[in-house]
């Protein structure tokens, strides 16, 4: 392992710029700061060697430094070839944390970066995984199965990665206990909804400068991400059409006043298309052929499988790169398609991703999950678990002061009437916020 690079980033000279930006992000991430305040002396993650595969952004930098403050050794790669913020990566690498990430990796470089995080500098392998999308989890299970027995747990950040964990569990291939961070209420109902509500528009605007008011926007999927995207597009004056497979989500969309139809129909009407489903083959060749001239097409689901970019590359008459992560395709019918971020995450490929405050919710859950799996290993046989409701409420509580929120306290009489502890949890596990 002696020939291993101590880090690989785009430009280490960006570290000072990154450090200034990280300091600002810290002030917007009260949950992570609370974790440092509570645990930096006891260091509950001492001995943990955490391999992380998650967008290497300023917010992730605050997460990494929280994990190290709590005693962990950490190595990091990004979970998307376009999502790294190079100044953030440089700032973390300069502190001595091995980071292997830069914006604009090839697919081969992407896998190489992940592999660099498997073994630490002393030759010892990872014993914890912090994942976003499942690529690190899948790589270790398929290529490094001899290491699985030494791994105490996996914490998974996003919907796509959680789907992957449940598929592995049902097929019997999952060999490590995992916590589903995505479905913590303070993750899915905040990051997925409010984060996308702001960062989608940021990505589209930075990439295209398009006027959204008056346009027809098509949002594929009406889960938490789709809800946030639809709200944002409507707020900017677009007429929004939803596509859905689930009758419950479709009914929700209709009751909010959105038109709900199929992509075959919507592709003829839209000017802006956003996929949010986490599923494959949402926009296919026939849909591109239906679209109006210069329709803008983008994806905010984790992988680039939602849009048939391969069809565009094979069937377009011409492809012109307008600027980084913005490509204009000329189709045989004479119309153009503007594709953002090559069909990958538009909010991170074309903008800066979610704001720090909402990511503090998600990443505080990640820290709690890592502590839980590392310190209470015996409680977690192989399977997929949720964080307890009490911890979910604690994440929310850590963010209230920053917003000037004053919480009402139950009286003894009220608590007795409701059958609750005055300090919570306040809702049953099955409650749908």
Curated annotation (Swiss-Prot):
Essential cofactor(s): NAD(+)
Comment on bound cofactor: Binds 1 NAD(+) per subunit.
Involved pathway(s): Amino-acid biosynthesis; L-homocysteine biosynthesis; L-homocysteine from S-adenosyl-L-homocysteine: step 1/1
UniProt GO molecular function: adenosylhomocysteinase activity; NAD binding
InterPro entries hit by this protein: Adenosylhomocyst_ase-like_sf (IPR042172), Adenosylhomocysteinase-like (IPR000043), Ado_hCys_hydrolase_NAD-bd (IPR015878), NAD(P)-bd_dom_sf (IPR036291), S-Ado-L-homoCys_hydrolase_CS (IPR020082)
Catalytic reaction annotation: S-adenosyl-L-homocysteine + H2O = L-homocysteine + adenosine
This protein's record includes keyword Metal-binding: no
Location of this chain's protein in the cell: Cytoplasm
First-listed, main subcellular location of the protein, grouped into a coarse class: cytoplasm
Binding site for substrate: 57, 132, 157, 187, 191
Keywords carried by this UniProt record: Copper, Cytoplasm, Hydrolase, NAD, One-carbon metabolism
GO cellular component terms, A-Z: cytosol
Enzyme Commission number(s): 3.13.2.1
Coiled coil: none
Alphabetical GO biological process terms: one-carbon metabolic process; S-adenosylmethionine cycle
NAD binding, as annotated region: 184-351
Function: Catalyzes the hydrolysis of S-adenosyl-L-homocysteine to form adenosine and homocysteine. Binds copper ions.
Similarity comment text for this entry: Belongs to the adenosylhomocysteinase family.
Subunit: Homotetramer.
Name used for this protein in its record: Adenosylhomocysteinase A
Gene symbol of the encoding locus: ahcy-a
């Amino acid at each position: 392992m002696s020939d291993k690079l101590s880090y690989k980033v785009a430009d280490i000279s960006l570290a000072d710029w990154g450090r200034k930006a990280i300091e600002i992000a810290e002030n917007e991430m009260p949950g992570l700061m609370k974790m440092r305040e509570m645990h930096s002396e006891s260091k509950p993650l001492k001995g943990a060697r955490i391999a992380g595969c998650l967008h290497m952004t300023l917010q992730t930098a605050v997460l990494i430094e929280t994990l190290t403050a709590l005693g962990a050794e950490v190595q990091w790669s990004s979970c998307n070839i376009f999502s790294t913020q190079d100044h953030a990566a440089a700032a973390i690498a300069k502190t001595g944390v091995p980071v292997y990430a830069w914006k604009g990796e090839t697919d081969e470089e992407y896998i190489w970066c992940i592999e660099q995080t498997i073994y630490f500098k002393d030759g010892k392998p990872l014993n914890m995984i912090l994942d976003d999308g499942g690529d690190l989890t899948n790589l270790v299970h398929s290529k490094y199965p001899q290491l699985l027995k030494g791994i105490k747990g996996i914490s998974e950040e996003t919907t796509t990665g959680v789907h992957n964990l449940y598929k592995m569990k049902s097929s019997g291939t999952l060999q490590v206990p995992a916590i589903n961070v995505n479905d913590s209420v303070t993750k899915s109902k905040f990051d997925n909804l409010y984060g996308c509500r702001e960062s989608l528009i940021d990505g589209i605007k930075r990439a295209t400068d398009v006027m959204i008011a008056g346009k027809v926007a098509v949002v594929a999927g009406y889960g938490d991400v789709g809800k946030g995207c639809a709200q944002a597009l409507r707020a900017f004056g677009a007429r929004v059409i939803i596509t859905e497979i689930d009758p419950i989500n479709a009914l929700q969309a209709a009751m909010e006043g959105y038109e709900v139809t199929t992509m075959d129909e919507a592709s003829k009407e839209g000017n802006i298309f956003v996929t949010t489903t986490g599923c494959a083959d949402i926009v296919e060749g026939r849909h591109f052929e239906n679209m109006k001239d210069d329709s803008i097409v983008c994806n905010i689901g984790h992988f680039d499988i939602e849009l048939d970019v391969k069809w565009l590359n094979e069937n377009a008459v011409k492809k012109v790169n307008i600027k980084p992560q913005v490509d204009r395709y000329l189709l045989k019918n004479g119309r153009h398609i503007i594709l953002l971020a090559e069909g990958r995450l538009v909010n991170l490929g074309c903008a800066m991703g979610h704001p720090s405050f909402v990511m503090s919710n998600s990443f505080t859950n990640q820290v709690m999950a890592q502590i839980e799996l590392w310190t209470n290993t015996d409680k977690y046989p192989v399977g997929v678990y949720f964080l307890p409701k009490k911890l979910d409420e604690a994440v929310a509580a850590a963010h209230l002061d920053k917003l000037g929120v004053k919480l009402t306290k139950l009286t003894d009489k009220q608590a007795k009437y409701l059958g609750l502890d005055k300090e919570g949890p306040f809702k049953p596990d099955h409650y749908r916020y």
